[in-house]
Amino acid sequence: DDFAWESGSNVLSQPPYSFDLSVMDWVPALLSHGTLKALPKQTADDFKSLFKTLPTLNLHKWVSTPSFADVALLDPEFKQSVHPNLSAFFFCGEVLTKTTAEKLLARFPDAHIYNTYGPTEATVAVTSIPITQAVIANNNKMPIGYVKADTEIVIQDADGEMVADGEPGEIIIVGPSVSRGYL
């Protein structure tokens, strides 16, 4: 619900299914009666083949690491006019750089870009933020967003005490998406 995922979307399925990021493509796609557009590893690894294949997929949703988007951005034809139905990008698993965000917004002005955070044990995206021109203008590093409603995140020191804002510590995630066995 957080991402307004439309029914029947064509969804890029690029991450290997052993990578927790893949949950962000196949679960919403299946729940919304969408179609997974699987990208074979050999296609993803061969830029010429990748650049030729992407426009044929008629994508609506893009789920990947930011570095995979950086590869796609090497193709000058990776833009809204060539991918008119591509309405949203979802990133997790790596840092989304300001440069990547700027390039995507410039090339896909009608698309929504979401930066998310969430480790494997917390079932991937426990935070998210729409990346807009204002977010880019006001941040040197792209923020990971706000905690979803059913989750709590706190930062603790080595003794389990809460730390002051801006102080280093361990990220503690509490909520129903945290896998069993994690404390």
Where are the regions a protein language model picked out?
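Motif- and composition-driven signal specific to adenylation
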Residues: 1-165, 170-179
